[in-house]
Amino acid sequence: MAGLMTIVTSLLFLGVCAHHIIPTGSVVIPSPCCMFFVSKRIPENRVVSYQLSSRSTCLKAGVIFTTKKGQQFCGDPKQEWVQRYMKNLDAKQKKASPRARAVAVKGPVQRYPGNQTTC
């Protein structure tokens, strides 16, 4: 009987500890940070997107580029080529916005009488 009481007490203690350890509400996940910048420029046609690393959460402010193959690298935001890549990617994103890419169907819709069903 003493063994059962020890197990129950231990489980209650673990439950109380777990309740205080597990955070409540939303958990803030820091954004990726740049530890170093690439020394060579990556060809612009391989880059598909970018995101900024925050200076408030990272030691260095940087631009994280993603390539077509999913590889990521950091660029120095002070470099001219990094600023140009960001500007060009922003322009591409603007062109690809849903409002600009609305497609209209031209011509009449054809209906085939053989496909209709009657009840």
From Swiss-Prot:
> Keywords for this entry?
Chemotaxis, Cytokine, Disulfide bond, Glycoprotein, Inflammatory response, Secreted, Signal
Q: List the disulfide bonds.
A: 33-58, 34-74
InterPro entries, per this entry? Chemokine_b/g/d (IPR039809), Chemokine_IL8-like_dom (IPR001811), Interleukin_8-like_sf (IPR036048)
Provide a GO CC annotation, any one: extracellular space
Give a GO biological-process term: positive regulation of cell migration
Under CDD domains, the record lists: Chemokine_CC
Q: Annotated Gene Ontology MF terms?
A: CCR chemokine receptor binding; CCR3 chemokine receptor binding; chemokine activity; receptor ligand activity
Domain of life, per UniProt, equals Eukaryota
| A Pfam family the protein falls into | IL8
Q: Where is the signal peptide?
A: 1-26
PTM summary: N-glycosylated.
The record's subcellular locations are: Secreted
Glycosylated where? 115
Q: Which family does it belong to?
A: Belongs to the intercrine beta (chemokine CC) family.
**What does the UniProt function comment say about this protein?**
Chemotactic for resting T-lymphocytes, and eosinophils. Has lower chemotactic activity for neutrophils but none for monocytes and activated lymphocytes. Is a strong suppressor of colony formation by a multipotential hematopoietic progenitor cell line. Binds to CCR3.
Q: What is this protein called?
A: C-C motif chemokine 24
Q: Which organism is it from?
A: Homo sapiens
The taxonomy runs: Eukaryota, Metazoa, Chordata, Craniata, Vertebrata
